[in-house]
Design a protein with these regions (language model features):
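Juxtacatalytic substrate-recognition/specificity segment
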Residues: 1-56, 62
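Flexible glycine/proline-enriched surface loops and loop-helix/loop-strand junctions
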Residues: 50-56, 109-114, 125-127
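Catalytic Zn2+-binding segment of zinc metalloproteases
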Residues: 27-44, 69-88
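Solvent-exposed, acidic/flexible segments
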Residues: 13-25, 59-67, 118-126, 133-134, ...
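Solvent-exposed, polar/charged alpha-helical surfaces in well-ordered, non-transmembrane soluble domains
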Residues: 22, 71, 126-130, 134, ...
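Short helix/loop segments within enzyme catalytic domains
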Residues: 72-103, 139-146
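Active-site rim elements
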Residues: 56-60, 112-119, 145
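Beta/coil-rich, acidic/histidine-enriched accessory regions frequently appended to metallopeptidases
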Residues: 116, 144-187
């Protein structure tokens, strides 16, 4: 059994979906993610450290994936969700209209910039996760999480798994996803 306590305030975005439904779908996906990461050495760590024993595993997974996967889930399991709002794609669309295909390096897209508007980790992650599900098998992200729990001793296990599953580096996967979005919007 799992338990989740949600202390919420009203949603600040206009959405047709009830806010608590969207929030519970999103947060429940994080519960599923941590359950998938609670394997191997990290499971042993939870016996010693309680719920905090899984923290190193979560630290090996990029934040964009954790949040993007949760937004992807909330969008797919409801009639609303942020992935269905045009404003959610605005940073990507604006950039592609102004500059064409990415002139900024991957790290600037990922980490943001004080000078240029960039998507946050929810938007960045939703684009990456959604493209991964569209282009590759639905097991791509499951395999990446399993790789983290089986080989946490590698420097970046999540990215090694991504390369193994897709044949692309994280930067190449991002460029491919951005080019796909550009081609869809140009149709």
């Amino acid at each position: 059994p799992r338990r989740m306590e949600i202390v919420s305030q009203h949603d600040f975005n206009a959405s047709p979906e009830p806010w608590l439904l969207t929030l519970s779908l999103h947060e429940n996906r994080h519960v599923v993610q941590t359950d998938k990461l609670n394997r191997g050495i990290f499971r042993a760590a939870t016996y010693l450290l309680g719920d905090q024993g899984i923290a190193p595993a979560v630290g090996l997974v990029p934040l964009w994936f954790l949040e993007g996967d949760a937004v992807y889930t909330e969008t797919n399991l409801s009639s609303g969700g942020r992935g269905r709002q045009s404003s959610f794609y605005q940073p990507f669309r604006t950039h592609l209209l102004q500059h064409g295909r990415s002139i900024y390096p991957y790290d600037k897209w990922l980490m943001g910039s004080y000078k240029n508007a960039r998507p946050n980790h929810y938007q960045f992650g939703y684009m990456m996760v959604g493209y991964g599900y569209l282009k590759y098998e639905s097991d791509i992200w499951k395999s990446s999480l399993e790789y983290v729990t089986k080989r946490p001793y590698t420097l970046f296990p999540f990215y090694f798994s991504l390369k193994k599953e897709t044949g692309l580096s994280r930067k190449e996967l991002f460029q491919s996803a951005l080019h796909y979005l550009d081609s869809v919007w140009n149709e």
